[in-house]
Amino acid sequence: MQNYIKSEKAFKEAKKVLPGGVNSPVRAFNSVDASPVFMDHGKGAYITDVDGNEYIDYVLSWGPLILGHADPSVVNAITNSAMKGTSFGTPTEIETELAKLVIERVPSIEIVRMVSSGTEATMSAIRLARGYTKREKILKFEGSYHGHGDSLLIKAGSGVATLGLPDSPGVTKGLAADTITVPYNDVEGAKLAFEKFGEEIAAVIVEPVAGNMGVVPPIDGFLEGLRELTTEYGALLIFDEVMTGFRVDYYSAQGYYVVTPDITCLGKVIGGGLPVGAYGGKKEIMEQIAPAGSIYQAGTLSGNPLAMNAGFETVRQLTPQHYDVFRSLIKRMEEGLTEISNRHEVPLSINKAGSMFGFFFTDQKVTNFDTAKTSDLEFFRNYYREMLAQGIFLPPSQFEGVFISTMHTEKEIDATLEAFDVTCKMLRG
């Protein structure tokens, strides 16, 4: 039986100085009716909390750690970089090297700008799209979370879905009016929006695989339909690949689905666990950004050497073969979860994409936010706490993706399936 004495004490102290005791809402464990676990260290596929409890980690810092915790090459790259200085506020050669690697692997990107977070990447991409097209409206999809920028925090998923809020106080009516939302995977809904607002829409922003309503892949024709619509109406297509970049495929989601956007937003994996973001695209669009053009964007720590070195070393190590292994392991997980859930008569719907997957306690096929919300949240809460007690660390929200790393093997998958079996038996009696 796990004990969380030190975590509970740490949370009590944190609540004195941090809003809700955390620096990102989902970390508070509110949606699973529990107190957060405070972590101490990680290695490979495992993470250990301050009480000494060890877990198989499927959160992986919410996706960035595709090589697992404390990869020796990444740690070495960060250490060597830090010994030279943590930041200079000037260009460094490693920025160019990481940019070249990103351009080589992401089909849509000819030029890329480094920033410090995924939110900063999507906010900047929206500004760029508006400046480039001279239009103001943005089309996004219900349940898709593109960071906490005001323009995009409209009918968002992830932590917002967990909190039961359709948007956030503080987002002005004017910004909300310039954001059009339609259901994810609904090309016809997007067509209707363009028929009504087509000449005003600057861009469509979409996760090629939704990752903040759980994992929801695109249905056939969805991404292709968006590409056709944006081309027809002169709007830009923005892929938010902050989560899916280098997670879904060696060439990211756009390479896997063979749909090329005008602008791509990246983050997570390209920082190797350090704060990072990036946005890039066609040369003619990206050259509108200052100092090459007049659309302003800047950042004190943009392209900082620690994150650039960590990201370069992470992306450099990834090979196409890694993605074959990811798919094999997740197939093993899917087959095991399905067999166990059927045996215990637990409704379960599973989605997967590359090294990420999601599961919902529902008998419906999950293709959008509405179907994601049919998941049995009370069952999820109880399931989560039991899995945690058995040493399985999952995202503490039904509406988050689950990740594996190059350090996960059949051993970890099988241990997770065994824990799931025990949990289902316990909850179903």
Curated annotation (Swiss-Prot):
GO terms for biological process: protoporphyrinogen IX biosynthetic process. GO terms for molecular function: glutamate-1-semialdehyde 2,1-aminomutase activity; pyridoxal phosphate binding; transaminase activity. Homodimer. Its cofactor is pyridoxal 5'-phosphate. Belongs to the class-III pyridoxal-phosphate-dependent aminotransferase family. HemL subfamily. This is Glutamate-1-semialdehyde 2,1-aminomutase 1. It comes from the Bacteria. Its EC number is 5.4.3.8. The keyword Cytoplasm applies. InterPro entries: 4pyrrol_synth_GluAld_NH2Trfase, Aminotrans_3, Aminotrans_3_PPA_site, PyrdxlP-dep_Trfase, PyrdxlP-dep_Trfase_major, PyrdxlP-dep_Trfase_small. Gene3D superfamilies: Aspartate Aminotransferase, domain 1, Type I PLP-dependent aspartate aminotransferase-like (Major domain). Pfam families: Aminotran_3. The gene is hemL1. Its main location: cytoplasm. It is an enzyme of class 5 (isomerase). It catalyses: (S)-4-amino-5-oxopentanoate = 5-aminolevulinate. Keywords: Cytoplasm, Isomerase, Porphyrin biosynthesis, Pyridoxal phosphate. GO terms for cellular component: cytoplasm. Pathway: Porphyrin-containing compound metabolism; protoporphyrin-IX biosynthesis; 5-aminolevulinate from L-glutamyl-tRNA(Glu): step 2/2. It is found in: Cytoplasm. The keyword Kinase does not apply. It comes from Listeria innocua serovar 6a (strain ATCC BAA-680 / CLIP 11262). The modification N6-(pyridoxal phosphate)lysine is found at residue 268.
